[in-house]
Amino acid sequence: LGVLVTIFLVLFPMATLQLDGDQTADRHAGERDQDPLEQYRNLKHVLRRTRNYYLYPARPENSWWT
């Protein structure tokens, strides 16, 4: 009986119901009306920002922990 309750109360809703936030992430860029050039620019911007963060992390010169 506990197995059936677990299946119907936990596993069944997790498998069938989809959250609203997950729906747009599953679509391709073309379906979101984003052309490949715009997608490439966004990706390039994020990669550049990430690289700069690791090369030059934010460390103020006059902070109390340095």
Curated annotation (Swiss-Prot):
Protein biosynthesis is among the record's keywords: no
Modification note: Ac1-O6P is hydroxylated once at Pro-60, whereas Ac1 is hydroxylated at both Pro-57 and Pro-60. Trp-64 is supposed to be a D-amino acid in Ac1-O6P.
Propeptide residues according to the Swiss-Prot or TrEMBL record: 18-51
Domain of life of the native organism: Eukaryota
Keywords annotated in UniProt: Cleavage on pair of basic residues, D-amino acid, Hydroxylation, Ion channel impairing toxin, Ionotropic glutamate receptor inhibitor, Neurotoxin, Postsynaptic neurotoxin, Secreted, Signal, Toxin
Signal peptide feature range: 1-17
Cellular component, GO, one term: host cell postsynaptic membrane
Primary location recorded for the protein, binned into one broad class: secreted
Compartments, as annotated in UniProt: Secreted
Residue list for modification D-tryptophan: 64
GO molecular function, one term: toxin activity
Tissue: Expressed by the venom duct.
Residues bearing PTM Hydroxyproline: 57, 60
Its job: Ac1 weakly inhibits N-methyl-D-aspartate receptor subunit 2B (NR2B) (IC(50)=8.22 uM). In vivo, shortens sleep latency and extends sleep time after lateral brain administration. Is more potent than Ac1-O6P for these effects. Also has an analgesic activity similar to that of Ac1-O6P. Ac1-O6P has no or very weak activity on voltage-gated channels and receptors tested. In vivo, shortens sleep latency and extends sleep time after lateral brain administration. Is less potent than Ac1 for these effects. Also has an analgesic activity similar to that of Ac1.
Family: Belongs to the conotoxin A superfamily.
Protein name in the entry: Conopeptide-Ac1
Source organism: Conus achatinus (Little frog cone)
